[in-house]
């Protein structure tokens, strides 16, 4: 089994696959009579013309490290954002595409409270909270059409921290 090492999650490192969603620095603007800071437009949400943005709640079972990555998926009709409700860190495995096959895998681990938006058509692992079960608000495409493609890996990867 090949090994895949977890690398630091930064906006720059994750940019080819999506967006890091985090409260970094001061807010972009103050709202509600100055009592609330708004960190504005943190993700490149992208849905086809027949879909719309929807919010779902996911309740995911805990995983541990090292983690066996044996299945990835992608969503050709829309992006998918994961926002932790419990502050549980989660593993984010992503890959480039080569003619419908995931290649050049990378792995990241969120810090408590960080979320990610995964771009449309980007191969990624399933939701994997590390160390404890996690609940997540997920913003993704709701609508007609096949928006899920799964790819079982012929040779699983062992993700290590």
Swiss-Prot record:
Reactions catalysed, as given in the entry: (S)-ureidoglycolate = urea + glyoxylate
Xref: NCBIfam families: PRK13395.1
Family: Belongs to the ureidoglycolate lyase family.
GO molecular function: ureidoglycolate hydrolase activity; ureidoglycolate lyase activity
Enzyme Commission (EC) number: 4.3.2.3
Pathway assignment: Nitrogen metabolism; (S)-allantoin degradation
Family annotation (PANTHER family): UREIDOGLYCOLATE HYDROLASE (PTHR21221), UREIDOGLYCOLATE LYASE (PTHR21221:SF1)
Subunit structure and binding partners: Homodimer.
Protein name: Ureidoglycolate lyase
Gene Ontology terms describing biological process: allantoin catabolic process; purine nucleobase catabolic process
């Amino acid at each position: 089994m090949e090994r895949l090492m977890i690398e630091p999650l930064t906006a720059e490192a994750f940019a080819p696959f999506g967006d890091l969603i985090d409260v970094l620095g001061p807010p972009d603007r103050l709202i509600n009579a100055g009592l609330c800071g708004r960190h504005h437009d943190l993700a490149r949400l992208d849905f086809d013309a027949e879909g719309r943005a929807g919010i779902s709640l996911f309740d995911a079972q805990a995983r541990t490290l090292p983690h066996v990555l044996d299945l990835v998926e992608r969503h050709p009709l829309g992006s998918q954002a994961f926002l932790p409700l419990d502050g549980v860190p989660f593993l984010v495995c992503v890959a480039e595409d080569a003619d419908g096959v995931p290649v050049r895998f990378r792995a990241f681990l969120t810090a408590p409270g960080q979320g990610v938006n995964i771009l449309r058509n980007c191969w990624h692992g399933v939701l994997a909270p590390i160390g404890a079960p996690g609940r997540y608000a997920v913003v993704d495409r709701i609508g007609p059409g096949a928006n899920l493609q799964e790819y079982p890996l012929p040779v699983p990867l062992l993700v290590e921290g």
